Amino acid sequence: MDLIIQNLEKEYMKKDIPEIWPGDTVRVHYRIVEGDKERIQVYEGVVIAKKHGGIRETITVRKVVQGVGVERIFPLHSPLVEKIEVVRRGRVRRAKLYYLRERKGKAAKIAEREENEG
């Protein structure tokens, strides 16, 4: 039974998703439908969490707008997600970066990861 579900989910999974890790700064192009109009909104921020796996995989992206922290959860394999770009690689030692919620300014900055680092 589990194999049947995996095969069914596999055909709906996207193949063009880049490798994303917590601490990375990403730009998510998200399709928004308002009435009969459709537009693409670009949301740029730091990945603070990556959850689940397979077709249910989600990322939580955080950004600060006019001094207020805004977080949004994106399902990676959703047809509404047009494209995801990795702007910057961050170097962190945690899988969940929820501690960034309490930090402000320079304390919330994440060091950039060099290409040869794991």
Curated annotation (Swiss-Prot):
The keyword Magnesium does not apply. The keyword Zinc does not apply. One of its GO terms (biological process) is translation. It comes from the Bacteria. InterPro entries: Ribosomal_bL19, Ribosomal_bL19_CS, Ribosomal_bL19_sf, Translation_prot_SH3-like_sf. Keywords: Ribonucleoprotein, Ribosomal protein. One of its GO terms (cellular component) is cytosolic large ribosomal subunit. Pfam families: Ribosomal_L19. One of its GO terms (molecular function) is structural constituent of ribosome. This protein is located at the 30S-50S ribosomal subunit interface and may play a role in the structure and function of the aminoacyl-tRNA binding site. PANTHER family: LARGE RIBOSOMAL SUBUNIT PROTEIN BL19M (PTHR15680:SF9), RIBOSOMAL PROTEIN L19 (PTHR15680). Belongs to the bacterial ribosomal protein bL19 family. HAMAP family: Ribosomal_bL19. This is Large ribosomal subunit protein bL19. It comes from Dictyoglomus thermophilum (strain ATCC 35947 / DSM 3960 / H-6-12).
